[in-house]
Amino acid sequence: MNTKFIKHHIEQNRVDTFVKYTRRYLKRMNIRLEFRQGATVRTEDGESAEGFFYEPEGKDKGVIVIAKGRPRREWLTTLAHELGHVNQWLTEDVVWSKGGLPAERDAENHSQKLIKKFNLPVDARWHKIQSKKYISFLKKTPYTDNER
């Protein structure tokens, strides 16, 4: 058998396991996970994003929405990042209530840990570079506290 074929199937199994774990984890907190086909998704504010998280409110379920029309490593890092925000919300972390750059930095750190924990097919160096670019981009944009 072709080693590339085997490697791909092993990686896909890790991805499937991670997504299955994520769905079960989120279901316990009344949050659903949605994948959309495009390269970006629209938030309730009409903003274009690679993914987003809205916490549950009252009887309304929360949601994580991920744009899956991008390379696998990109949507996986976005999903892990949004799970970082779920963790902030769940633990009532001060960075969640304040929002802004500290919340994004924390979510990026959380995503790196999740990717490592689940041994996902995302190159750690690539991810670190992308995280730095993302944080640099946010520093240049009018991203205020209480904004998530």
For every predicted segment, state its role.
Residues 1-9:
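A short, surface-exposed helix-loop junction/capping segment
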Residues 24, 34-61, 72:
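Catalytic zinc-binding patch centered on the HExxH motif and its immediate surroundings
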Residues 3, 71-74, 116-148:
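Long, well-structured alpha-helical subdomains associated
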Residues 89-98:
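Substrate-binding clefts and substrate-entry loops adjacent to catalytic sites
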Residues 11-29:
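Zn2+-dependent metallopeptidase catalytic core
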Residues 62-79, 98-99:
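Short pre-active-site segment immediately N-terminal to the catalytic Zn-binding motif
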Residues 98-128:
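Post-HExxH zinc-binding segment in Zn-dependent metallohydrolases
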Residues 77-90:
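Active-site recognition of the HExxH zinc-binding catalytic motif
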